[in-house]
Design a protein with these regions (language model features):
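Bacterial N-terminal signal peptides that target proteins for export
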Residues: 1-9
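Exposed acidic/polar residues on beta-strands and adjacent loops within beta-sheet cores, strongest
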Residues: 23-243
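Secondary-structure junction/capping motif
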Residues: 2-3, 16, 243
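Bacterial N-terminal signal peptides
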Residues: 8-17
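Domain-scale selection of a single, long terminal region
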Residues: 16-20, 24
C-alpha cells in the first residue's frame, strides 16, 4: 500500500470525523424562549378543576423552540439547573359539540383554556417533558419549587385524603408524603391549600391547608438525580411512584 493511499485514508477519516462532530454541534444548538404575556378568556365553566370562582382571565406565554411555537404556558418559570427549567403548561381545548355549526369569522367561541401539567424544558436539547408528580391534582396542588424539589398538597387516587408532598424531579418516590386531612371532592375549601413555604437552613417546608394550622416538616437534602441527556434518543420522562 502506497504512502499516498494511507495518507488519503487518514484524511478521509479525519474529514468524516470532523463532519460528524460539526453536525452534532449544529444539531444541539437550540434557542428556547418564552414569549410575551397575553391575556385570554378563562372561566370555571371551561376549567372546572383549576379555575377559581370569578376568575375570568388567564395570563399565558408561548414556549418557542427555534422560533417554533411548541406549547402555551402559564405562571412563573423556575430554573432547576443552568440549562433546565420548569413551567406549567396550559392547554387549549376544543369545546365544540358535534352538533355545533362553525360561525364564520369566529375562531374562539368553541375553545377553552385549561391549566395543565408541569413541563421540564431543556434549553440545550430543546426537549420538553411532562412531569409526573405523585398525587398531583390540577385543581388542588399549588406547587412551590426549590432547587429540584416540588412541594404541594396532593390528593390520593381514591380522592379521600389530602397529603403534604415533596417530590424530586426524576426521583423514584416522594421525598415526603404525609397525610394532612381527609378530602371531600364534592365539598372542600377553595383553595384547599395555599402554596407551601420553603426555608433553606435547616431545609424545611411549611404547608398551609385551609381551615387548620400550618404544618412544617424538615427535609433531609440530597443530591440531584436529574440526568440532562445530550444524546439523540428520547429521554425517559421523569417519573415518581405514588403510594
Amino acid at each position: 500500500v502506497s504512502k499516498t493511499a494511507v495518507f488519503s485514508a487518514f484524511a478521509l477519516l479525519a474529514t468524516l470525523s470532523s463532519g460528524s462532530l460539526t453536525h452534532a454541534a449544529e444539531r444541539k444548538k437550540h434557542i428556547v424562549a418564552l414569549g410575551a404575556l397575553k391575556s385570554v378568556p378563562y372561566s370555571k365553566a371551561g376549567d372546572p378543576a383549576s379555575a377559581a370562582t370569578g376568575e375570568d382571565v388567564l395570563k399565558i406565554r408561548a414556549l418557542f423552540v427555534d422560533g417554533v411555537l411548541k406549547e402555551w404556558t402559564t405562571g412563573d418559570a423556575h430554573d432547576v439547573t443552568d440549562r433546565s427549567f420548569v413551567v406549567r403548561r396550559v392547554i387549549r381545548l376544543n369545546d365544540a359539540l358535534p352538533s355545533d355549526k362553525p360561525i364564520p369569522g369566529d375562531k374562539a367561541s368553541h375553545w377553552v383554556w385549561q391549566r395543565g401539567p408541569w413541563l421540564l424544558v431543556d434549553r440545550v436539547s430543546g426537549r420538553e417533558t411532562a412531569l409526573r408528580l405523585p398525587d398531583y391534582d390540577t385543581g388542588v396542588s399549588q406547587v412551590s419549587w426549590f432547587r429540584d424539589y416540588a412541594a404541594y398538597c396532593g390528593v390520593t387516587p381514591s380522592r379521600k385524603s389530602l397529603y403534604a408532598v415533596v417530590a424530586q424531579i426524576a426521583g423514584r418516590k416522594p421525598v415526603l408524603a404525609k397525610k394532612l386531612a381527609a378530602f371531600d371532592p364534592e365539598n372542600h375549601p377553595d383553595p384547599v391549600c395555599a402554596a407551601p413555604d420553603w426555608q433553606r437552613e435547616p431545609l424545611r417546608i411549611t404547608f398551609h391547608p385551609a381551615g387548620t394550622d400550618a404544618v412544617s416538616y424538615d427535609i433531609v437534602p440530597g443530591s440531584a438525580v436529574l440526568v440532562e441527556d445530550t444524546g439523540d434518543e428520547d429521554e425517559t420522562p421523569p417519573a415518581t411512584s405514588t403510594k
